[in-house]
UniProtKB/Swiss-Prot annotation:
Stretches in topological domain Extracellular: 25-1236
Tissue: Expressed in brain.
Organism, scientific name: Mus musculus (Mouse)
UniProt name for this protein: Contactin-associated protein like 5-1
Compartments where located: Membrane
GO MF term (any one): aspartic-type endopeptidase activity
Sugar-modified residues: 282, 496, 622, 1057
Boundaries of every Fibrinogen C-terminal domain copy: 584-790
Signal peptide extent: 1-24
Membrane topology: Single-pass type I membrane protein
GO biological process, one term: cell adhesion
Keyword match Glycoprotein: yes
CDD domains reported in the protein's UniProt record: EGF_CA, FA58C, LamG
C-alpha cells in the first residue's frame, strides 16, 4: 500500500510539469512552416483583386505575387485552412511581390471551425502585430503563447498610405494530437476504481474544455464520510467544491471554495489545472491561478467507487442526474496521471461511457459584435404586411442601456422597439394617434451572459419571452393589432433614416448577438458579411469580442470591479483606499504625519506602507506631547492572575492587536523607538529561574522565537531589569521573582528592542505549588518618531545622484516625495527599460514634467505653477500610472491627468537602476534636497545611501522656512534634524502647534499678579530672545490680547500698573460695553468707550489692543476702533499686570475701583501682553515665574473657540500606576480579575461620589456666605451680578472632577 502514494507523488510531479510545458507551447522543434504542402484552396480571403483565390504563401512570386483585396478597408482579411488542429508558435508576413502594397500592422485570429473566431491576446488585450515597411522583407513574430487551431486569419489594420493592402503570409508550428470526448448535455463518463475507496494525499487533475452553454458539471466524486470534489460551470464561471473528511459539509449545502474564470461559454477552448497537496491547493483556469486551503479535518481525499465526468448520475436511476450536465467537449482529461478519455476510447473496463462520442461536434453558430455605441447597426429584411410578427435572437453585453431592435410596422401599426434600459428588457409599440403598449421583464441583463429573447404577435396578442426556461418569469402579454414590417434594425439606426423607419430613443447597443430568426427563419450572417443580405455598419461578423475587464480584478485592496463594454470602474467604498483602481490610501503613514497635517490627539488609522499591500491599522495618536506617541492596544491589557500552571500544564495567553504581524512589523520598523511595559507580580512563582536554570516564564515576539529576558533587560541575557541594575531582592538571582519568597514581589520594566516587538504570547509554568501565584500584565505597544517622513538628502553637484534597485511594478505605480531647490531645473528620478521608462523632472522654475512610456509610446504630463518652485521651500510631488490613467500632482495645484489608451500595453517594464537626483547620463542633475521618497508605498532610505555616496549629504536643514507658519499664536519654529518643533514659550497657547488655549476660571476674589522683572527659566536652556523682552520695560509698542466670558458688569478684566501710580485698565462698564482707561499722569486720564453690545452675555469675546507710539487701535471681536494720544504723552515703566481682582493698596480710579469691588467672575483665556503670557505662567510655571495667585484659580476648558481648535486633554496612564502605591510588594486585589474586584470597585465608587457631593455642598454654602457679605453694597452697586453663572461653572467643574478615572 505504501507504493501507491509514492507512485501518485511521482505521477503528480511528472504530469504537472508536462501540463505546464504544453500550456506554454513548446516543443523546441515546433517551428516548421505549416503551409508548405497546402493547396491553393487552403488560402481564402474576404475579396481578391483577381476575383478568385490567389496563393499568398510567403516568398510567392507568381501571378499577382500575393494577396491584395478588391478594396483596401478595415473589413478585409486573409486566412489559411491548415486542414487539422495544429500547434501554431509563430507567424511571418511580406508585402505583395513587386508592388507598393504591404500591411504595416495587423491582428491574428484563430478558429477550429472557420467560424466564431477568437483574436490573439497578449497582456490581457487584443494584440497588434507590427507588419512590413516594404514588399520584400520578412517580418517574423514568435508568439508568446502558442495557439492550437485549424484556421488562422490575418486582419490588416494599417497599410502603406501610398499603396494598398498586400500580404504574403506563413504560420509556423507542428502537429497536435489530443484525446477528445463530446458530451451532448445528457451523457456522462464514469471512471471506476479498482478498490472501493480511492484515498489520495496529492491530486493533479487537468483538462481542456469547450462549452456550448453556461452551466454544467465537468467532474464529480464523493465519499461516505463527507469527502467530495466537484468542478461545475456556473453562469460561465468555474466553481470548485472540495472538502476533506467533513461529514457536515454536504455538496448540496456548501458554497464553492473557489470561483475562477468568466465567459467560459464562448465555445472556445479553456484549460483547467487542479493541484493539491494535503490541504494546500492551486486552481488554474487559463492563465489565472488561485492558491487556497481546503476545508475538512484530514489531508487525504477519500472518493468511493468512481469519478464521474460530464454530470452527476443518480445511483440506480439510469439517465437521471443531480445537476445540469455539461454540454460541450473535453480534451486531454487526466486524473492523477490516468488518461481518462484514452481509456474510454479503448473501452477499458474501468470506464463506463454513456452516449459519449470521441470527436468534437461544432455547431456552425455565427455571432456578431456591435462595437460602436453611436454608429453600429444591422439591418435584416423581413416579410411585410403579415398579420403577426415573430423575431427571436440571443444577446450578451455589459452595458445597462442600448437599442436591441427597431422596426416600422405595416398598416399603420406603429413602431416596435425593444430596448435594454437599466439592465431591464423593455418592449414598446408606439402608435401615432393612439396610446402605445409597454412590456417590461428581467433585471441585471447586462451580466455578460447569453440571454434569449423572443417576440411573437398572433391574433391580436403580443408576447415577450426572456430566457425560455423553468426559471424565467411568466411572459407578459398585451392585446394589440400589429402587422410585420419590411426592415428590422438590430443594435442601432443608420444616420440617413427618418424616425418612422428606425427609432432609437437610447444609445446604440454594444455587445454580441447570434441565432437571429425573423418569421421563424434563421438569418445567414455570413451572407450579410459578403454583402448579399441586408446591410450593416461597425460590426465584427463571425466573432463575439466580449471581454471580461474585471478578470483579473485590477481593483486593488478589495475594491469591487464594475464594467461596461469599453472599460471598467472600481468601487472603493469601505476599503480605506481611493483612486481609479483603489490604489491610494486615504490614511496617513504615521502619527507624525497626522501631526504635521494639523490633527490633534485621537484614534486614527495608520497605513504604514501607503499604497502597498498592507491594510490600515487603528492606533491612538497622542499628539499633545513633544514626542508623538502611537499606541496599539491588544486584547488583554488588564492584570491577569495565574494559578495552577506547571511545565506539564503551562499557562499561555496569545495577544491580538487587531492587525496582521506584517502590519505591526511595518509600524515598528518605521518608528524611531518602540516599547511595551511588562509587569510580573509573583509569590512563590519564579520568572526566569536565574542564574542557571531553565526559565519558567518566557514570551514570544514577532517571530516564533522564545525570549527568556524580562522588561528592563537586554536581549541575549537571561535577566530582569533589577539584574542589570544589581538591585534584585536576592543578589544570587537576576530577577526579584526568582528569589522564590512567600511574599509578593514584582519585576516590571520595558521591552524596547524593536526586532523582538510586539509581544504576541506569554507562557507561565510555575504557579502550581502551595501558595504559588502570579499576576501579569503586558501594556500596549507604544512607538514614537517616523524614520521616513523627514528622511532627506542634499545634492550638491549636478553630477551627483543616488542609485537604487530597479523599480519593479506591474499594473500600478505611484511615486511621491518632497523637494526644495534654488536651481532652475533638474531631474528628480529616472528609471529606464529596453523601451519603457519614466522620468520626473523640474523642467523650469515653474514647471514639473512626468514623462513615461509603458510600450504605447511616450507621453508627458506637465504641471505649471503660478509661483516659482525654486524658492527654497518644500514642495510636494506625486506621480501615478495605472490601467485607467496617468496623473501628476504638485502641491495643491490642479492635477494633470491623461486617460490610458484602450487595449494597449499597461505593464511598466524597467531594467536599469533607479536614479534619484540625476540620470544615467549624469546630465541635468538636481541641485537641492529630496525627502520622504515613496515608491508604491515602499519607503526609500535616502539618508543611508547618501552616507556612502559622494556629492550627496544626509539630511537637509531649513524646515522652518517652509513649515514655520504651522506654529501659530506667536509660537517660534525650531529646527530639528528630523523636522521641526514649535516653541510656545512666548505664546499664551500651548500644544504641538501652539494652538491649544490656556484658560482659567476666576472666582470673585481670584487675583493673578505678574511682576515685570528678569525672565523666568521656562525651559532648560533660557533663550536670548526671551530675555530680550524685558530690556525695555516702558515699550514704545505694546500689544494686549485676551478672551473672556462672563455675566458680570461692571467688572475688571485686566489692570496694568505703571510707575508713578499710572495704569491701564480694561473693564466692562455698567451696561456691559467695553471700556479702556489710561492714566498717564496725575492730572490726565484717557477713557475710550466702545459702543458695543452688552458683553456680559455668557459668550466668548476677544479683545486686542495695539499701540504704536501715540497711535492706539482697539479691536473688540470684529469691531475695530482707532484713537490717538497727543505726541507729548509719556508712557511709564511697567511694574505689574493683574488679572481678576486688584488686591494691592493702590490709588485706583473710582470707576476702576467700582469694577474691581466684586472682582471678576468668569473665564479668561489666551491672555498676552507683548511676549508675556501671565495666565500661562500662573498655570504652568507658578513656582519659577514672577507671578502670584490669590484665592482659587481653576484651569478650565471654557476658553475661546474662535481662532483655535480646542485640543482634547489626554491623560496617559502607566500600566503600573495602580501598583506599589499602597503596598510595594502585593498587587492590589481589586486589580485582579475576581469577584472581590467588583465588590471593592463598587464600594470605592460610592465612597468617592459621597465625597464629591460633600465638596459640592461645601462650595455652595461658601458662595452663599460670600453673597451675603455683598448685601451691604447693594445700594451702591446695581443688582446685575449673575450668581447663577458662577454656580453653573462650579457645578460643572466639580462634576468634571468627579468623573476622573481611577484604577480600583
Amino acid at each position: 500500500m505504501d507504493s501507491v502514494p509514492r507512485l501518485n507523488s511521482v505521477l503528480t510531479l511528472v504530469l504537472s510539469g508536462l501540463w505546464h510545458l504544453g500550456l506554454t507551447a513548446t516543443n523546441y522543434n515546433c517551428d516548421d512552416p505549416l503551409s508548405n504542402f497546402l493547396s491553393l484552396k487552403a488560402f481564402s480571403s474576404s475579396s481578391d483583386i483577381t476575383g478568385s483565390s490567389s496563393s499568398a504563401q510567403l516568398n510567392w512570386r507568381m501571378g499577382t505575387g500575393g494577396w491584395s483585396p478588391a478594396d483596401s478597408n478595415a473589413q478585409q482579411w486573409l486566412q489559411i485552412d491548415l486542414q487539422n488542429r495544429v500547434e501554431i508558435t509563430a507567424v511571418a508576413t511580406q508585402g505583395r511581390y513587386g508592388s507598393s502594397d504591404w500591411v504595416t500592422s495587423y491582428r491574428l485570429m484563430f478558429s477550429d471551425t472557420g467560424h466564431n473566431w477568437q483574436p490573439y491576446n497578449q497582456e490581457d488585450s487584443i494584440w497588434t502585430f507590427v507588419g512590413n515597411m516594404n514588399s520584400d522583407s520578412v517580418v517574423h513574430h514568435k508568439l508568446l503563447h502558442s495557439v492550437r487551431a485549424r484556421f488562422v486569419r490575418f486582419v490588416p489594420l494599417e497599410w502603406n498610405p501610398n499603396g494598398k493592402i498586400g500580404m504574403r503570409v506563413e504560420a509556423y508550428g507542428c502537429s497536435y494530437r489530443s484525446d477528445v470526448a463530446d458530451f451532448d448535455g445528457r451523457s456522462s463518463l464514469l471512471y471506476r476504481f479498482n478498490q472501493k475507496t480511492m484515498s489520495t494525499l496529492k491530486d493533479v487533475i487537468s483538462l481542456k474544455f469547450k462549452s456550448m452553454q453556461g452551466d454544467g458539471v465537468l467532474f464529480h466524486g464523493e465519499g461516505q464520510r463527507g469527502d467530495h470534489i466537484t468542478l461545475e460551470l456556473q453562469k460561465g464561471r468555474l466553481a470548485l467544491y472540495l472538502n476533506l473528511d467533513d461529514s457536515k459539509a454536504r455538496l448540496s449545502s456548501t458554497v464553492p471554495l473557489v470561483i475562477l474564470g468568466s465567459l467560459l461559454d464562448d465555445q472556445h477552448w479553456h484549460s483547467v489545472l487542479l493541484e493539491r497537496v494535503g490541504k494546500q491547493a492551486n486552481f488554474t483556469v487559463d492563465m489565472n491561478t488561485q492558491h487556497f486551503r481546503t476545508k475538512g479535518d484530514t489531508d487525504s481525499l477519500d472518493i468511493d467507487y468512481e469519478l464521474s465526468f460530464g454530470g452527476i448520475p443518480v445511483p440506480s436511476k439510469p439517465g437521471t442526474f443531480l445537476k445540469k450536465n455539461f454540454h460541450g467537449c473535453i480534451e486531454n482529461l487526466y486524473y492523477n496521471g490516468v488518461n481518462i478519455i484514452d481509456l474510454a476510447k479503448r473501452r477499458k473496463h474501468q470506464i463506463y461511457s454513456g452516449n459519449v462520442t470521441f470527436s468534437c461536434s461544432e455547431p456552425q453558430i455565427v455571432p456578431i459584435t456591435f462595437i460602436n455605441s453611436r454608429s453600429s447597426y444591422l439591418m435584416l429584411p423581413g416579410t411585410p404586411q403579415i398579420d403577426g410578427l415573430s423575431v427571436s435572437f440571443q444577446f450578451r453585453t455589459w452595458n445597462e442601456d442600448g437599442l436591441l431592435l427597431s422596426t416600422e410596422l405595416s398598416e399603420g401599426s406603429g413602431t416596435l422597439l425593444l430596448i435594454l434600459e437599466g439592465g431591464t428588457l423593455r418592449l414598446l409599440i408606439k402608435k401615432v394617434a393612439r396610446h402605445g403598449t409597454e412590456i417590461l421583464t428581467g433585471s441585471g441583463l447586462n451580466d455578460g451572459l447569453w440571454h434569449s429573447v423572443s417576440i411573437n404577435a398572433r391574433r391580436n396578442r403580443v408576447t415577450l419571452t426572456l430566457d425560455n426556461d423553468a426559471a424565467s418569469p411568466a411572459p407578459d402579454t398585451s392585446r394589440i393589432q400589429i402587422y410585420s414590417g419590411k426592415s428590422y434594425y438590430f443594435g442601432g439606426c443608420p444616420d440617413n433614416l427618418t424616425d418612422s423607419q428606425c427609432l432609437n430613443p437610447i444609445k446604440a447597443f454594444q455587445g454580441c448577438m447570434r441565432l437571429i430568426f425573423i418569421d421563424n427563419q434563421p438569418k445567414d450572417l455570413i451572407s450579410v458579411q459578403q454583402g448579399s443580405l441586408g446591410s450593416f455598419s461597425d460590426l465584427h461578423i463571425d466573432l463575439c469580442s466580449i471581454k471580461d475587464r474585471c478578470l483579473p480584478n485590477y481593483c486593488e485592496h478589495g475594491g469591487h470591479c464594475d464594467q461596461t463594454w469599453t472599460t471598467f470602474y472600481c468601487n472603493c467604498s469601505g476599503t480605506g483606499y481611493t483612486g481609479a483602481t483603489c490604489h491610494d490610501s486615504i490614511y496617513e503613514q504615521s502619527c507624525e504625519v497626522y501631526r504635521h497635517r494639523g490633527h490633534t490627539a485621537g484614534f486614527f488609522y495608520v497605513d504604514s506602507d501607503g499604497s502597498g499591500p498592507l491594510g490600515p491599522l487603528q492606533v491612538y495618536c497622542n499628539i499633545t506631547e513633544d514626542k508623538i506617541w502611537m499606541t496599539v492596544q491588544h486584547n488583554n491589557t488588564e492584570l491577569t492572575r495565574v494559578q495552577g500552571s506547571s511545565p506539564e500544564n503551562p499557562y499561555s495567553m496569545t495577544l491580538n492587536y487587531g492587525g496582521s504581524m506584517e502590519q505591526l512589523e511595518a509600524l515598528i520598523d518605521g518608528s524611531e523607538y518602540c516599547e511595551q511595559e511588562v509587569i510580573y507580580h509573583c509569590r512563590r512563582s519564579r520568572l526566569l529561574n536565574t542564574p542557571d536554570g531553565a526559565p519558567f516564564t518566557w514570551w514570544i515576539g514577532r517571530s516564533t522565537e522564545r525570549h527568556p529576558y524580562w522588561g528592563g533587560a537586554v536581549p541575549g541575557v537571561q535577566q530582569c531589569g533589577c539584574g542589570l541594575e544589581e538591585s534584585c531582592l536576592d543578589s544570587r538571582h537576576f530577577c526579584n521573582c526568582d528569589a522564590d519568597i512567600d511574599e509578593w514581589a514584582n519585576d516590571t520594566g520595558l521591552f524596547s528592542f524593536k526586532d523582538h516587538l510586539p509581544v504576541t504570547q506569554i507562557i507561565i509554568m510555575d504557579t502550581n505549588r502551595t501558595n504559588s501565584e502570579a499576576a501579569w500584565r503586558i501594556g500596549p505597544l507604544r512607538c514614537y518618531g517616523d524614520r521616513h517622513f523627514w528622511n532627506a538628502v542634499s545634492f550638491s553637484t549636478e553630477a551627483s545622484y543616488l542609485h537604487f534597485p530597479t523599480f519593479h511594478t506591474e499594473f500600478s505605480a505611484d511615486i511621491s516625495f518632497f523637494f526644495k531647490t534654488t536651481a532652475l531645473s533638474g531631474v528628480f528620478l529616472e528609471n529606464l527599460g529596453i523601451k519603457d521608462f519614466f522620468r520626473l523632472e523640474m523642467s523650469s522654475p515653474s514647471e514639473v514634467t512626468f514623462a513615461i512610456d509603458v510600450g504605447n509610446g511616450p507621453i508627458e504630463l506637465l504641471v505649471q505653477s503660478p509661483y516659482p518652485l525654486n524658492d527654497n521651500q518644500w514642495h510636494y510631488i506625486r506621480a501615478e500610472t495605472n490601467l485607467k490613467e496617468t496623473s501628476l500632482q504638485v502641491d495643491n495645484l490642479p492635477q494633470s491627468m491623461r486617460e490610458a489608451s484602450e487595449g494597449g500595453h499597461f505593464r511598466l517594464q524597467l531594467n536599469s537602476q533607479l536614479f534619484v537626483g540625476g540620470t544615467s547620463s549624469r546630465q541635468k542633475g538636481f541641485l537641492g534636497c529630496i525627502r520622504s521618497l515613496l515608491l508604491n508605498g515602499h519607503k526609500v532610505d535616502l539618508e543611508e545611501r547618501a552616507k556612502v555616496t559622494s556629492g550627496v549629504r544626509p539630511g537637509c536643514p531649513g524646515h522652518c522656512s517652509s513649515y514655520g507658519s504651522n506654529c501659530h499664536n506667536g509660537g517660534k519654529c525650531v529646527e530639528k534634524h528630523t523636522g521641526y518643533s514649535c516653541d510656545c514659550t512666548n505664546s499664551p497657547y500651548e500644544g504641538p502647534f501652539c494652538r491649544k488655549e490656556i484658560s482659567a476660571l476666576f472666582d470673585s476674589g481670584t487675583s493673578v499678579t505678574y511682576m515685570f522683572q528678569e525672565p523666568y527659566p521656562v525651559t532648560k536652556n533660557t533663550s536670548l530672545s526671551s530675555s530680550a523682552i524685558y530690556t525695555d520695560l516702558a515699550p514704545f509698542k505694546e500689544t494686549i490680547m485676551l478672551s473672556f466670558m462672563t455675566t458680570q458688569a461692571p467688572t475688571l478684566l485686566l489692570y496694568l500698573n505703571f510707575s508713578s501710580q499710572n495704569f491701564l485698565a480694561i473693564l466692562l462698564s455698567r451696561n456691559g460695553s467695553l471700556q479702556v482707561r489710561y492714566r498717564l499722569s496725575k492730572d490726565e486720564s484717557h477713557v475710550f468707550n466702545m459702543d458695543t453690545e452688552n458683553l456680559a452675555n455668557r459668550r466668548v469675546h476677544q479683545v486686542k489692543i495695539s499701540r504704536d507710539g501715540p497711535e492706539l487701535s482697539i479691536q473688540m471681536d470684529q469691531q475695530l476702533f482707532s484713537y490717538s494720544f497727543s505726541p507729548e504723552v509719556e508712557f511709564r515703566t511697567l511694574r505689574s499686570l493683574v488679572l481678576g481682582k486688584v488686591t494691592e493698596t493702590l490709588d485706583l480710579d473710582p470707576e476702576v475701583a467700582r469694577a474691581n469691588t466684586l472682582g471678576f467672575v468668569g473665564c479668561l483665556s489666551s491672555v498676552q501682553y507683548n511676549h508675556i503670557a501671565p495666565l500661562k505662567a500662573a498655570l504652568r510655571h507658578a513656582s519659577i515665574a514672577p507671578v502670584t495667585v490669590q484665592k482659587t484659580l481653576t484651569e478650565s476648558s471654557c476658553g475661546s473657540m474662535v481662532d483655535s481648535d480646542v485640543n482634547a486633554v489626554t491623560t496617559v496612564h502607566s500600566l503600573s500606576d495602580s501598583f506599589g502605591k499602597t503596598d510595594d510588594h502585593e498587587p492590589l486585589q481589586n486589580a485582579v480579575r475576581s469577584d472581590s474586584a467588583v465588590i471593592g470597585g463598587v464600594i470605592a465608587v460610592v465612597t468617592f461620589i459621597t465625597f464629591c457631593v460633600i465638596g459640592i455642598m461645601t462650595r455652595f454654602l461658601y458662595q452663599h456666605k460670600q453673597s451675603h457679605r455683598t448685601n451691604q453694597m447693594k445700594k451702591e452697586y446695581p443688582e446685575n451680578l449673575d450668581n447663577s453663572f458662577r454656580n453653573e461653572i462650579d457645578l460643572q467643574n466639580t462634576a468634571t472632577e468627579c468623573k476622573r478615572e481611577y484604577f480600583i
